[in-house]
Amino acid sequence: MDLFSSLPFYVQPDPLQNSPAPQQSSGTDDTASQSGPAISCHSGPAAASNDQLVKLVSGIFNESFGFRPDGKPYRLGLKSVTERLTATDYLFVAGDDHSGIGYLFGKEIPSSYGRIAWVESMAVLPLYRRRGIATALVSAFARATKAAPRLGFATPNPIAALIATRIMPGKMYIGPCSPPYALRRLLKEIRQDCFDLRGCHIDEGNMTIKTGFSPLSRSDQREWNPRRPVAEPSWWKFVEHLPNEFEALLIIET
């Protein structure tokens, strides 16, 4: 089941614990330390031309998202991965480039309201979840795009949103929050350059999009279940109980 389980790694805090986000060293290649896994950074176009990285991203995705409502497994083939990486700015891989355990790719999207750093896809192999891998990946992306005044992504999983809010300081928009006019216009303006938003209905008032992405395994870990007593975020229940065909939008303005 787990194609990459032989890779050693270093444990980071669980994002549901009441602890600060881990800090990583700067640079394009973070070596492994006791605080987390090694995170390598590649430009999207360079990664798209690297057969090993394309296979790695496809393999991690295919092991991570379970099944469609019709019972067929979610798959991201080599051709689709190549196309997605060609059109993005950064690929981050947790572990090494031959036997990684997680990835994130994303890009900065310009608009007349300023740039936004958008996480286009992130996945961590099931065996390695709740070990800080996603936190390390989002941290690396946030450092690489720190000049952008906003971070955004679409997700069906409240844990992903929690990770981002613990890493990025700033004003958060998620759930029924009545975002300002400028933010609504930004979403409309970037939608053709954003894979998540292209062709989707955007409910700006509730910060959701209706997509065809509804993996049945998404309910594996969506309940608020911290290891230490800590208050549940006000938006958590809204994201936890979204219908399967919807994803939440999160934007953080720094």
Where are these regions (language model features)?
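A conserved beta-strand-loop-helix scaffold within acyl/acetyltransferase catalytic domains
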Residues: 57-122
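Conserved acetyl-CoA-binding loop-helix of GNAT-fold acetyltransferases
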Residues: 124, 130-143
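Amphipathic alpha-helical protein-protein interaction segments
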Residues: 46-50, 112, 118, 122, ...
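Terminal substrate-recognition subdomain of acyl/acetyltransferases
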Residues: 2-54, 63-64, 85, 146-254
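Eukaryotic short linear interaction motifs
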Residues: 99-102, 109-115, 125-131, 159-163, ...
